[in-house]
Regions:
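A detector of single, family-specific signature residues
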Residues: 1-168
């Protein structure tokens, strides 16, 4: 009986693994289409963002120009900090979580890439992804990566929990 159950679990695992590989291949095909290719390459210059996350950001956000500032986009994702204030009493809260939960989850997972490595360090994988982009895009992404890593480590030094530092 145990052997049959284990065999059933293994067959299910193999089936799901094959399905994930098919979806990943399809995502790679979509990302190489002309209308997505350039944007996916640019977003890939950031730490933690690979094809799936970049394509999801592009497709689900649509036109990034509709957001005048980054804080408006953060509110759209539910990553903006909440606040409960009255008169002189100001209470700052965590992220609102009122927004696109799928993109928020993807960006929080992508932020895990910031947690690894020293400030200013580039992995071989990141260098490879940045290779085909312009110097302006790479400089912008490097500046953002350095800022995010510095901010993460600063939060940790000041005693914030890791998950709070990652989301910030």
């Amino acid at each position: 009986l145990y052997r049959e159950t284990l065999d059933e679990y293994l067959a299910s695992y193999d089936e799901h693994t094959a399905k994930i590989e098919r979806f990943d291949k399809r995502i790679e095909e979509l990302s190489s289409q002309e209308r997505y290719c350039e944007k996916v390459k640019k977003l890939g210059c950031f730490l933690g963002i690979r094809t799936h996350t970049a394509l999801s950001l592009i497709v689900e956000t649509g036109d990034f120009e509709r957001f005048a500032k980054g804080n408006i986009y953060a509110a759209y994702l539910g990553l903006a900090p909440g606040e409960r204030s009255s008169s002189d009493n100001i209470n700052r809260l965590g992220i609102t979580k009122a927004g696109n939960s799928h993109l928020r989850r993807l960006l929080i997972e992508a932020a895990g890439g910031i947690c690894k490595g020293a400030v200013g360090h580039k992995s071989k994988d990141l260098r490879q992804r940045q290779k085909d982009n312009t110097a302006e895009v790479i400089a912008y992404a490097d500046k953002a990566n350095t800022r995010l890593r510095s901010r993460y480590y600063r939060f940790l030094r000041h005693g914030k929990r890791r998950n709070v530092a990652v989301a910030a």
